[in-house]
């Protein structure tokens, strides 16, 4: 017996389409509100080590090539330079990057859910998990934003791979599929 679902529909109606676009944006707004109200821009925990190691000279590559896994991630090095030069080293900058990265991952889930015509109730459940309490804790801790960004990149890679596998690839999908793993692994995973 076959159960009816959204996959049987040829077109997702307008209300569902809006929900797929709106929930990741609402999640971002919620995370930014949470960061504003639950944390202050003060150096603590992981950041004490980062401040002592990097702030005197953020352009020094010798400080980048050390044994610490969090500091060897190239995207962290780049964001730290931007943070120091434009914001005078603000912890909130890293937290906002984390919120944006979680929302990018949620957007990838939304795109994949639209592509597969996932039932809207399941999509809402995915979004609840995506913006759940474990993300809030990691956001206020701060330095884990690059991990959220890596998740978003991996999810995007899965979307492209699935599209290619089903024979629905777009013009640049094959090229991006060949380059993206290198960029993800070397840029966001160290």
Task: Report residues per predicted region.
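Transmembrane-helix motifs of polytopic, lipid-linked glycan transferases
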Residues: 96-122, 156-160
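Helix-to-loop transition at the C-terminal end of transmembrane segments
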Residues: 30-51
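Membrane-interface transmembrane helices that cradle and orient dolichyl/undecaprenyl
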Residues: 154-177
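Membrane-interface alpha helices of multi-pass inner-membrane proteins
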Residues: 173-190
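Start-transfer (signal-anchor) and selected internal transmembrane alpha helices
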Residues: 1-31
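Transmembrane-helix signature of polytopic, membrane-embedded enzymes
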Residues: 113-133, 151-152
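Short hydrophobic/aromatic helix or loop-helix immediately within or flanking a transmembrane segment
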Residues: 65-89
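Multi-pass, polyprenyl lipid-linked donor-dependent membrane glycosyltransferases
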Residues: 136-156
């Amino acid at each position: 017996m076959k159960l009816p679902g959204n996959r049987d529909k040829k077109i997702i109606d307008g209300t569902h389409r809006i929900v797929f676009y709106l929930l990741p944006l609402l999640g971002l707004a919620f995370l930014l509100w949470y960061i504003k109200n639950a944390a202050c821009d003060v150096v603590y925990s992981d950041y004490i080590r980062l401040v002592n190691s990097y702030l005197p000279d953020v352009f020094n590559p010798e400080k980048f090539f050390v044994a610490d896994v969090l500091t060897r991630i190239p995207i962290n090095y780049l964001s730290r330079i931007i943070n120091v030069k434009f914001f005078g080293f603000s912890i909130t900058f890293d937290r906002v990057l984390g919120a944006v990265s979680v929302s990018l991952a949620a957007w990838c889930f939304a795109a994949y859910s639209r592509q597969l015509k996932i039932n809207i109730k399941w999509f809402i459940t995915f979004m609840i998990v995506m913006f759940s309490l474990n993300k809030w804790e990691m956001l206020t801790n701060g330095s884990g934003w690059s991990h959220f960004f890596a998740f978003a990149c991996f999810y995007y890679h899965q979307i492209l791979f699935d599209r290619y596998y089903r024979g629905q690839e777009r013009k640049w999908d094959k090229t991006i599929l060949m380059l993206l793993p290198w960029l993800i692994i070397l840029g966001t995973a160290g």
